[in-house]
Amino acid sequence: MTQSVPLLLRAARGENVDRPPVWMMRQAGRYMKVYRDLRDKYPSFRERSENPDLSYEISMQPFRAFKPDGVILFSDILTPLPGMGIDFDIVESKGPLIKDPIRNESQIKTLRALSPSESCPFVGEVLKRLRDSVGNEAAVLGFVGAPWTLAAYVVEGKSSKNYAVIKAMAFQEPELLHKLLDHFADSIANYLCYQIDSGAQVVQMFDSWAGQLSPIDYETFAAPYQKKVIDLVKKTHPETPMILYISGSAGVLERMGRTGVDIVSLDWTVDMAEGCARLPQNVGIQGNVDPGLLFGSPESIRARIIDTVKKAKGRKFILNLGHGILPGTPEENARVFFEAGKSVNELISQT
């Protein structure tokens, strides 16, 4: 029976659905009071994301509050790094810090192949519990960072404004960078397969910093490794829909559609109608409401959702933001977003 399959999974597979499913990137997080209360009690981000009880609880907070159509694992794209021999910490308000940035070949040679069941079994445990808890009321989503973005963090050593260190490596020692990217592609594909085997029904790959590359360099340093991850996962899990997100992707949108991914997640700088026109019909679209709009009035949120959904008509489509929800967003406006998404057919019929 079709209805026993969650709406988001059916939509992601390209089946006909009554309405677009809706979820939000970073839907579990700082804008929610219950999350901030828990953060005060457990100030270490790594503890919150690596303790299975805490990760499960945080993943479930937005589901209990808003009943989105997707429940995404609360974790971090850097979570698999220690399993490869790269230690990191996440400092509140500063972001990730890599203990020993990767800058030479001897460091790359010492990297281990990732064994997720040994180095991050808590991820598998949380995904299993989420599947048990949400049943067919929502799809469970897993996620990873793409090779370029992981490399950007581990080479730079932290977040960066201009990515000068990794770009210097790219243009001075490209073979060195390719070795690192290739290592990450194999390990990340393995990690995604582990997440799917543990219960993830849809998975998203974040190449957050690939938008910092020119199109020609995207084709050299990002796209081939996105494609390698996708191909490796599809080899063993062909039925699992895969989503690709890049922040600032307007310049590489068509290239994203050629990676073999099932769904491209648009950021808000691309008009939904234009994004649909620029991607092949067989590639689904996710997005792409500006998260800043959630500081606006309920009327403006509803109007933008109507506009976005109308422009995506006829496409395989998942309603989402164009980036993660911002800290400080009023919780009531997040509720408006979810409720408007779920009742979008009625809202459109009233316009």
From Swiss-Prot:
GO cellular component: cytoplasm
Transmembrane segment boundaries: none
Reactions catalysed, as given in the entry: uroporphyrinogen III + 4 H(+) = coproporphyrinogen III + 4 CO2
Top-level class of the enzyme under EC nomenclature: lyase
Pfam families noted in UniProt: URO-D
Chain positions of site Transition state stabilizer: D76
Record GO biological process: protoporphyrinogen IX biosynthetic process
Record-linked Gene3D superfamilies: 3.20.20.210
GO molecular function, one term: uroporphyrinogen decarboxylase activity
SUPFAM superfamilies hit by this protein: UROD/MetE-like
Pathway annotation: Porphyrin-containing compound metabolism; protoporphyrin-IX biosynthesis; coproporphyrinogen-III from 5-aminolevulinate: step 4/4
Keywords attached to this entry: Cytoplasm, Decarboxylase, Lyase, Porphyrin biosynthesis
Localization per record: Cytoplasm
EC number in record: 4.1.1.37
Main subcellular location of this protein, as a coarse class: cytoplasm
Residues that hold substrate according to the record: R26, Q27, A28, G29, R30, D76, Y153, S208, H323
UniProt function note: Catalyzes the decarboxylation of four acetate groups of uroporphyrinogen-III to yield coproporphyrinogen-III.
Oligomer status and interactors: Homodimer.
Family: Belongs to the uroporphyrinogen decarboxylase family.
Protein name in the entry: Uroporphyrinogen decarboxylase
Gene encoding the protein: hemE
